[in-house]
Amino acid sequence: MIRMPLATASLLAIAISLAGCGDDKDKAAAPQAAAPATSTVAPAAGAVDEAAAKAVVKHYADIVFAVYSDSLSTAKTLQTAVDAFLATPNDDTLNAAKAAWVAARVPYLQSEVFRFGNTIIDDWEGQVNAWPLDEGLIDYVDKSYEHALGNPGATANIIANTQIQVGEDKIDVKDITPEKLASLNELGGSEANVATGYHAIEFLLWGQDLNG
């Protein structure tokens, strides 16, 4: 049976024309026979095909909607798997939560391309996908741990403490809530302080990355 501190469980729980120009004809050339009239009129050079443009926009919107829908669905599945792990912590539920995390990352990573077309996404993206992170903000780390230079919260260890101190500020972390965790992102002005999102959950499920 896997035993987990209540703080760890709480933190883990809270935790998308080429326009061709023909050569001029020789005006002295012999006249050619007139071609039969047709019902199709070629669009003027540079003209926009409104129907085609609308079709492209609709297709793009459909793709975006599908990707974000998949991302939301798999995130909810991840939440369910994490809840099951917290309720019954063992190897099976842990592995199921890890598998759900991996599955949830696929559509979310696909959604990253759409950030460049909608700046609103950047308002919350950091709460979901910020990286890299100093794991010592969240929990204990190996002695070989190296953190971002000048990060005052690099070894704060939210899970092991009811209060953390960053510089002259003392922060109550006795009760871990979504709002509290969100407020700890970029703590002390360091982008390496990440308390929410996929990578914080990844650390809680797999532990510290010692391969880098």
What are these regions (language model features)?
Residues 1-8:
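Bacterial N-terminal signal peptides that target proteins for export
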Residues 12:
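Flavin (primarily FAD) cofactor-binding/catalytic cores of flavoenzymes
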Residues 15-18:
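Bacterial Sec-type N-terminal signal peptides, specifically the leucine/valine-rich hydrophobic h-region
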Residues 21-25:
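Bacterial signal peptide processing site
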Residues 26-46:
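Compositionally biased, proline/threonine/alanine/serine-rich low-complexity intrinsically disordered stretches
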Residues 42-212:
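Mature extracytoplasmic or organellar-lumen-exposed domains after removal of signal/transit peptides
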